[in-house]
Amino acid sequence: MLRKNAARCNMVPKFIYQKEDLYLRQISGNKLLVKALKEEGVDTLFGYPGACTIDISDELYRQSGIDIILPRHEQALVHEADAYARTTGKVGVCLVTSGPGATNLVTGLATANYDSVPLVCFTGQVARHLIGNDAFQEVDIVGITRSITKYGVTVRNREDLGRTIKEAFYIARTGRPGPVLIDLPKDVMAELGSAEYPKSVNIRGYKPNTSVHMGQLKKALKMLQKAKKPLFLAGGGVNIAHANEIFTSVVEKTQVPVVTTVMGRGAISTKHPLFIGNLGMHGSYAANMAVSSCDLLFSIGTRFNDRITGKLHEFAPNAQIIHIDIDTASISRNIHVDVPIVADAKEAITKMAEYVTDCGTHKWLTEIEAWKNEHPLTMRNRPLMGPLDIFDAINKQFDKAIIVTDVGQHQMLTSQFVDITENRQLIMSGGLGTMGYGLPGAIGAQIGNPDTPVISISGDGGVQMNIQELATAVLEELPVICCIFNNTYLGMVRQWQKLFYGKRYSMTNLRAGALSRRTDGEEYPEYTPDFVKLAESYGAKGIRVTNREEIAEAFEEAKKNTKRPTIIEFIIDPEEMVYPMIKPGGTLADMIMDC
């Protein structure tokens, strides 16, 4: 009324406008969060609601432009966001409630942290006055996840909210990418405050370096030119930096052969003549022998973890080592390097391309070719259908599909035998080795890449850790093809038990109870679970394949399901093994080729 009357007499007091404008600029923390997500370009959010985030969910309901994915478990949720981020190059965004909702993120956060995946995870928290009082669904999630996140913080004041969110996205995607956790007390999010969201941030003490020290790089290139047996080692950092094309160009200019880590698969096409194979625990004979024999190892974007080095003190014993990595902490942590270069992989490789020339590797390549011929990467011929039959079909029937694996024998076999021609085409939990990653990972990849075929490859053990995500795939109309290698065992552990534990198969037979009659005298079901019936109960398509002649037809049938997922269960001989294999405590040259 005051404003109306003042307007009539054209005498509106200034203080009234100032007070009203100030009020109009005040919004709740919940509204600011949604605004921030849009300004950061977020188009997909993976969330599971609860008491401490219900107001955020309500704000998300009111907006348009952000797709909300509702998984069936928070662990699966973060795996879906993880694979979405890996395959799109965007930041994956999660929202879960306090207490168990937050703690269910832990495995997924550790997975993303090991593999350098940019995530921003928002967790609900009880109101500030309840923190520390053992309130219902209260946990110190920032403290719990401190060692497995790149950064974590509880927002204690409403005025810090916008800046904190901006910092979270900046930290997650810059330097070595990684997961960031922001804990949001419910009362902070309800409080009114500024509607402004920062355009940029300047974080004291966090200045990620991407530029290349040219003195170090030129020193490295001189060593490369002088080497008689040079070798490139490409890790996941090459893929994260989207440097596969320029890396391939450098490889071709120098004619230096390449080995990759499992996470580096796709840094160069596996069909390229200068690609040797994966190195490490289940690397190819030629790749491991090349590392053991080279006189210069030029590593880009690797962590030199135990899966690729074998016995540390005998890794690449004849080589000088050059290491390019964006993470200072990764250099000389496990393996002493002669020339360290802290830089973004793509920037460093782009600079290399300006200077490199042919390194004269003809004799060295001939030696490597002899190793390839001596022990080609293959599997023993068996009368029953085996993994190689399935991989042959995938290579023939799918062009540039995204492959997402679980963890185990099938994972290593996939990395050995599936053709990978581009970066971010093979997705897996490489650092932490998380069972249950495969199906939700495939769902996240399919959401981010709706026009690309996505195939998950899992064992019958790992797939059951997040099998409930079939519901998510069905309701989101995702044509994910979920391949299950069913050998009725936890295969990788069984392989170790067979080779090193006297065939004492303890806790690995997934049908252990079926070895004896039930106490009620009835027979056990033939399949536990019956994956075909399970798929159908969710509304997915289920197919069981028992011989190699049925494989191609099964994949063609799956391709027809463009609006729902398909499970293809392959009945696999439990005696199938993954070779080569490095002996425990052995060097890369100590390979078991078969048993």
Regions found by a protein language model. Name each.
Residues 30-34, 38-43, 56-60, 369-445:
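Active-site diphosphate/adenylate-binding microenvironment
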